[in-house]
């Protein structure tokens, strides 16, 4: 999978500004990014799940208008965004990873993410939800039971 690495949030914002994707306009702030996207123990794995939303505004500055794809994945591990992984790069994956959006329509998602978001690694191009394999059988069974309601998604432990 192609990816682009950024040294900091400013470089990410410049990339998103220079490469206008889709038609949804975003204002971006690291704090707000952190609050709406999934966090992993490797940093922050950001997935846009706004397919059903016409416009989502995230404040970056008053005038920095940024267009990004609806279905994009951005892995952010940066001290400007989170204390996890200080000094690590920001990675934008291309092409967009499809399928992860289904999770955000799931009933009981909040409880699921409260317990398991730290072990979600990401989503691959085949709609496989990638989960850290270092889990007990009880947790794996709980994850499988939750995800099996969503036929579009399979779970792979890696």
Language model regions located:
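Acidic, low-complexity, intrinsically disordered interaction modules
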Residues: 46, 67, 71-72, 97-100, ...
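C-terminal alpha-helical interaction appendages
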Residues: 4-67, 71-101
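Detector for the mature cores of small, proteolytically processed
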Residues: 32, 39, 44, 145-147, ...
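Short secondary-structure junctions
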Residues: 23, 119, 152-154
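Short intrinsically disordered terminal tails
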Residues: 1-2, 96-101, 151-158
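Generic recognition of long tandem-repeat/solenoid scaffolds
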Residues: 91-93, 104, 129-131
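Short linear loop/turn motifs
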Residues: 74-79, 126-127, 158
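Short amphipathic alpha-helix segments
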Residues: 106-113
């Amino acid at each position: 999978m192609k990816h682009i690495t950024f040294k900091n949030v400013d470089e990410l914002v410049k990339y998103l500004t220079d490469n206008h994707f889709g038609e949804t306009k975003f204002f971006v702030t690291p704090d707000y990014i952190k609050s709406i996207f999934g966090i992993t123990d490797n940093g922050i794995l950001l997935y846009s799940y706004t397919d059903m939303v016409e416009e989502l505004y995230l404040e970056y500055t008053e005038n920095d208008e940024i267009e990004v794809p609806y279905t994009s994945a951005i892995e952010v591990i940066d001290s400007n965004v989170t204390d996890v992984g200080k000094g690590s790069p920001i990675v934008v994956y291309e092409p967009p990873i499809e399928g992860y959006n289904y999770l955000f329509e799931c009933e009981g998602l909040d409880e699921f993410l409260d317990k398991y978001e730290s072990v979600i690694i990401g989503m691959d191009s085949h709609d496989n939800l990638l989960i850290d394999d270092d889990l007990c059988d009880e947790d794996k069974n709980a994850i499988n039971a939750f995800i099996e309601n969503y036929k579009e998604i399979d779970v792979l432990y890696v």
